């Protein structure tokens, strides 16, 4: 039987991760619009075709960024699952090479996938990919203290709390405090 190459960079039992493409715009924007109640006030992903195009272009072209879509795998005939449906996204921003070899993660689940463990699996795959083929050493997540879901996801993937940064990021019209969570390649070994 011939080997068929996967369209995913990494796969788990229920999801695979792949890079963003311009062709993902319509589904991504539709998922963002469906998920506004879930995302607010923490997250403001692009919700128009033009905003998605600019966002995807940065993730595709900028070497200091890497964007990954977390996609549901086919759950089998009659399951009601759509093969390849986008469940969420994980971006590695501010990638620094040289002696630092690090990046900062940002992520979001979409409403239809929330609470099903798909983002836990997807984030774990991205971390493995970052420490494997990307050869990074450290990843950091900055989460607002009240964002219990984001903090729980970071903790469940082995990130440790390293500190607190007052007025760190400008979000929704104000400077917001953040907790800093990190993981290193040695912690995952």
Report the location of each language-model feature.
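Conserved GNAT-fold acetyl-CoA-binding loop/helix
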Residues: 37-57
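Acyl-donor (CoA/ACP) binding surface of acyl/acetyltransferases
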Residues: 1-27, 31-35, 71-189
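A short helix-loop-beta-strand connector motif used in the catalytic cores of GNAT acetyltransferases and
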Residues: 57-69
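Short, charged/polar low-complexity linear motifs in solvent-exposed/disordered segments
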Residues: 45-47, 57-59, 104-106, 179-180
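Short helix-loop boundary/capping segments at the starts of domains
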Residues: 34-37, 61
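Generic, well-ordered alpha-helical segments
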Residues: 20, 31, 44-51, 62
